[in-house]
Amino acid sequence: NIPTFRDKDGYWKNFPPFKDKNLEAQDLASPWAFRNELPHAWAFYEWRRRNAKENQPHEGYSITNKWLEPQDSFIHTTNTDGLHLRSGCPEDRVMEVHGSMWRLQCLNTCTHQFWEELSVTLCNLNTDTMKASNYPICKNCKGIARPHILMFGDGEYIGHPEQEANFRRFVEKPIDLAILVGSSGAVPTNDYIALNLQER
């Protein structure tokens, strides 16, 4: 299973070294962590990438794809695991609003570019200490790369202009139905969109 990190007990169970240092998921999923706790920050994401790679899209993805295929439809997801695209949903019909762990960008934002990186393993991971080493490198400046994910307290995420443009074009049309699946008040991005559509 792919953990949500909203259940603190489950999070601590997966990452005992982080419990010892009182590092919560929100601490590690931040630009601050990549500058101050780099071995732990990259360990957190490397573990998540390996976990996501081991998991396959469940039947719900196939059902959704078959249902949406004949419709003029779009998926707006806060998930960063890439499972919608892996399940066969067309790229031009998905908006990964919080980014994807399968893309990287420069930690120092030397350029407003991101690149796909599907390699697993991406860096060395010591699961006993939950420290990573041999980090991925920015293709441009050769500095450290980071996940192309909108993190907590993140003003440096560069977004995905193509996905954003596709979604803008879609929402300009009349929309008859919006379905929220697995939405949480803790991450209300999709809730806001649904409410906005409801008020049209």
Where on the chain are the PLM-derived regions?
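Conserved catalytic core of sirtuin-type NAD+-dependent deacylases
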Residues: N1-R200
